[in-house]
């Protein structure tokens, strides 16, 4: 992962060699610029830089006798004290694999030369910069780093990564040990004092020494910044980095035993670095953690690890301090420690490779493209779970039903949603789990679990996509878990508008309207649980329930029932909400003579919108004495005038009548022409039916003609 372009602004006092470093990088030989002559901006493309970078890294491997393992997650270096860690941090590029370098390089890198005497231009360039290459060359210019340059950057509000460059190293003694000591003595105080400084490197523009490394470190400071993930002063990973790493561990721990075994770590390694980890890789990682937590008596360390921290190691310690691998694997704390080792030793590319494999950005938040991938949905289409989506949520349910009781209790749900921001807001608004089928203990059943996700996908497919990402959907693009139905077509007949039949949908939405005390809430309860309460409680806020039902022929679908509550008038005036509704259930109390008049007045007020939505009239409480309705027209006559079926008499005590009502609601939603007010059945034949009739007639005619021809042939 790399940005399209970055700007490197080279700063420092006059005569420290800023322009010489740039020319040495470009020409691989020093060209003495004229005094106070600032170079024009230099643009380096990705392709220009890859080859030279690979050659540089290969040379570094040769000179340092360093053989990197193919396993990116491995780190063979031991850090015995803080100074050594800082030295390793300075030369960490030696651990970068040549075949990985291209991943770090932006498409275009622009290098901007500056002059300390032209403060106006310097400030302008700093505000456009992505990283600062800060150069000094002697003790005086070194002191001005903390006395002048860093205060200047902070006073300007510039919060950019800074790479320190000690130029003109050819003027220092040739001793390698003395050079390393000088590096540590110079860089460590500045790195500890100023969090903006990410690394320091000693260079020589004259000898072309470490110039490419310094330039690479500038790029790396942008593509793989250390500051978001590691606190150099505290020597620990930052909380903002620990949180996503814990989520990655949780997703990788497929058996949910709290440890990464060899198979799980190998899969994590393959996802992050493209190759599976070998058994020796795994053992070396475990040993690396063990040596950090439970060092042997032969290992030189700063402080002995307290016994209470030994659980971080995934291996058992032997009496003499050596460690052996157990079958459990790497714990969560051990995984965090492993990444801390990488970060503090300058291997933060490895940490970023892990984070970015799981779609984290530089701000350590999940990428919007990952959370909300593009899905083209026609305004007249709906979105449902695909077979892949069903399988994912079924597997997720089984995985977290730890006690195998067929239900997810509160603890199991909390564990399941650990890698997410929590239960979706939409679920809270729909009073989950009261919106679905639960078992006697109130635990979420698989039936209810799938129904809730169908409800979520129907109402807000973006929420489903978001949570698929959070929950670790790993079948490529999360849109594979969803399917978009065909757009709903609108037809007209005799000036009346109605919806065309649908045959590719499995989720249908039904509004239930009716007078207070008509039995709407009890109907929802019976739909879910097969029982209801006699205690009346008015519905204030809209209420949703969802459940799968079996249709004629054995096919199953999901039916969403929505009681609108006090928002009923507003919702029925909202065309976009009505477009989401597949059928309206007009319910009245057949034992209350005033109940049906409410529906008549409701349709008179909102009829211009309601007439386009399929309708089913239902007479509830049919087990009680039927009463003559006190309105101008009786229910049977009213529905006949609308060319609708007579009200279906339903009692919550009669399960068969309830099931028949739900089937009729789905039938009306699937074949709107049969239940749209004002549409006569005989004039609303579907286009597909006409085609079938024509084709059948044509087939009969062909058969007849063939029969006559055969008969005539026989007579001859």
Swiss-Prot record:
Record-annotated Miro domain positions: 3-224, 505-671
Task: Note the Pfam families from the entry.
Answer: EF-hand_5, EF_assoc_1, EF_assoc_2, Ras
Question: CDD domains this protein is in?
Answer: Miro2
* Domain of life of the organism encoding this protein: Eukaryota
Q: What class of enzyme is it?
A: hydrolase
- Cytoplasmic compartment segments: 1-692
| Occurrences of domain EF-hand (ranges) | 240-275, 388-423
GO molecular function per UniProt: calcium ion binding; GTP binding; GTPase activity
Q: How does it sit in the membrane?
A: Single-pass type IV membrane protein
Matching entries from InterPro entries are given as: EF-hand-dom_pair, EF_Hand_1_Ca_BS, EF_hand_assoc_1, EF_hand_assoc_2, EF_hand_dom, Miro, Miro-EF-hand_domain, MIRO_dom
What does the entry list as the binding residues for GTP 1? 84-91, 113-115, 167-170
**Annotated positions binding Ca(2+) 1:** 253, 255, 257, 259, 264
Gene Ontology annotations for the cellular component aspect, listed alphabetically: ERMES complex; mitochondrial outer membrane
Entry's transmembrane regions: 693-713
Task: Give the residues the record marks as binding GTP 2.
Answer: 514-521, 550-554, 620-623
- Kindly state which keywords UniProt assigns to this record, in alphabetical order: Calcium, GTP-binding, Hydrolase, Membrane, Metal-binding, Mitochondrion, Mitochondrion outer membrane, Nucleotide-binding, Repeat, Transmembrane, Transmembrane helix
Q: Which residues bind Ca(2+) 2?
A: 401, 403, 405, 412
User: Which segments carry the region annotation Disordered?
Assistant: 58-99, 303-327
Reported EC number(s) for this entry are 3.6.5.-
Segments in the Mitochondrial intermembrane topological domain = 714-716
Keyword flag Hydrolase:
yes
**SUPFAM superfamilies xref list:** EF-hand (SSF47473), P-loop containing nucleoside triphosphate hydrolases (SSF52540)
Q: Which family does it belong to?
A: Belongs to the mitochondrial Rho GTPase family.
Q: What does this protein do?
A: Mitochondrial GTPase involved in mitochondrial trafficking. Probably involved in control of anterograde transport of mitochondria and their subcellular distribution.
Q: What is this protein called?
A: Mitochondrial Rho GTPase 1
Q: What is the lineage of its organism?
A: Eukaryota, Fungi, Dikarya, Ascomycota, Saccharomycotina
């Amino acid at each position: 992962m790399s940005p399209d372009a970055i700007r490197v602004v080279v700063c420092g006092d006059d005569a420290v060699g800023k322009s010489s470093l740039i020319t040495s990088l470009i020409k691989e030989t020093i060209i003495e610029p004229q005094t106070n002559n600032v170079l024009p901006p230099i643009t380096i493309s990705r392709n220009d830089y890859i080859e030279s970078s690979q050659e540089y890294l290969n040379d570094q491997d040769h000179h340092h006798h360093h053989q990197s393992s193919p396993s990116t997650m491995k780190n063979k270096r031991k850090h015995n004290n803080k100074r050594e860690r800082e030295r390793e941090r300075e030369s960490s590029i030696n651990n970068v694999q040549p075949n990985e370098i291209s991943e770090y390089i932006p498409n275009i890198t622009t290098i901007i030369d500056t002059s300390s005497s032209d403060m106006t231009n310097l400030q302008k360039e700093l505000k456009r910069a992505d990283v600062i290459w800060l150069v000094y060359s002697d003790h005086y210019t070194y002191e001005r780093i903390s006395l002048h340059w860093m205060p200047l950057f902070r006073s300007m509000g510039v919060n950019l990564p800074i790479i320190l460059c000690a130029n003109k190293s050819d003027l220092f003694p040739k001793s390698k040990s003395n050079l390393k000591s000088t590096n540590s003595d110079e860089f460590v105080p500045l790195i500890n004092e100023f969090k903006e400084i990410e690394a320091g490197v000693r260079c020589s523009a004259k000898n072309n020494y470490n110039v490419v490394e310094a330039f690479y470190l500038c790029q790396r400071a942008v593509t793989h910044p250390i500051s978001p993930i590691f606190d150099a002063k505290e020597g620990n990973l930052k909380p903002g980095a620990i949180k996503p790493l814990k989520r990655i561990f949780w997703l990788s721990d497929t058996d949910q035993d709290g440890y990464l075994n060899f198979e799980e770590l190998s899969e994590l390694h393959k996802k992050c670095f493209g190759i599976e980890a070998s058994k020796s890789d795994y053992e070396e990682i475990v040993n690396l953690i063990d040596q950090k937590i439970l060092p042997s008596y032969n290992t030189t360390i700063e402080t002995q690890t307290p016994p209470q921290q030994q659980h971080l190691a995934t291996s058992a310690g032997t009496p003499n301090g050596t460690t052996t691998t157990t079958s459990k694997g790497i714990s969560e704390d051990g995984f965090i420690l492993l990444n801390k080792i990488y970060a503090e030793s300058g291997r933060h590319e490895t940490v970023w490779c892990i984070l970015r494999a799981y779609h984290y950005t530089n701000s350590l938040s999940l990428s919007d493209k990952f959370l909300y991938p593009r899905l083209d949905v026609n305004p007249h289409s709906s979105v449902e779970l695909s077979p892949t989506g069903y399988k994912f949520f079924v597997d997720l349910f089984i995985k977290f039903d730890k006690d195998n009781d067929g239900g997810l209790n509160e603890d199991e749900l909390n564990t399941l949603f650990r890698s997410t921001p929590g239960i979706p807001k939409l679920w809270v608004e729909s009073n989950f789990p009261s919106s679905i089928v639960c078992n006697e203990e109130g635990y979420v059943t698989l039936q209810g679990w799938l129904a809730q996700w169908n409800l979520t996908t129907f109402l807000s497919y973006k929420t489903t996509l978001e949570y698929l990402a959070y929950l670790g959907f790993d079948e490529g693009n999360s849109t594979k878990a969803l399917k978009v139905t065909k757009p709903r077509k609108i037809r007209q007949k005799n000036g009346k508008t109605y919806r065309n039949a649908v045959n590719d949908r499995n989720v249908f939405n039904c509004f239930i309207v009716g007078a207070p005390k008509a039995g709407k809430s009890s109907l929802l309860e019976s739909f879910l649980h097969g029982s209801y309460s006699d205690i009346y409680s008015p519905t204030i806020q809209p209420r949703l329930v969802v459940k799968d039902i079996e249709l004629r022929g054995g096919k199953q679908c999901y039916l969403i029932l929505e009681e609108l509550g006090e928002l009923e008038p507003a919702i029925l005036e909202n065309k976009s909400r009505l477009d989401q509704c597949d059928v309206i259930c007009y319910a009245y109390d057949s034992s209350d003579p005033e109940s049906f008049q409410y529906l008549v007045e409701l349709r008179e007020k909102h009829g211009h919108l309601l007439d386009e939505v399929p309708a089913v009239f239902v007479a509830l409480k049919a087990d009680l004495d039927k009463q003559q309705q006190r309105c101008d027209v009786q229910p049977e006559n009213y529905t006949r005038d609308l060319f609708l079926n007579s009200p279906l008499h339903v009692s919550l005590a009669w399960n068969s009548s309830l099931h028949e009502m739900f089937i009729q609601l789905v039938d009306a939603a699937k074949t709107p022409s049969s239940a749209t007010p004002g549409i006569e059945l005989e004039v609303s034949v579907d286009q597909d039916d006409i085609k079938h009739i024509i084709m059948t007639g044509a087939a009969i005619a062909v058969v007849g003609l063939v029969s006559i021809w055969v008969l005539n042939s026989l007579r001859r």
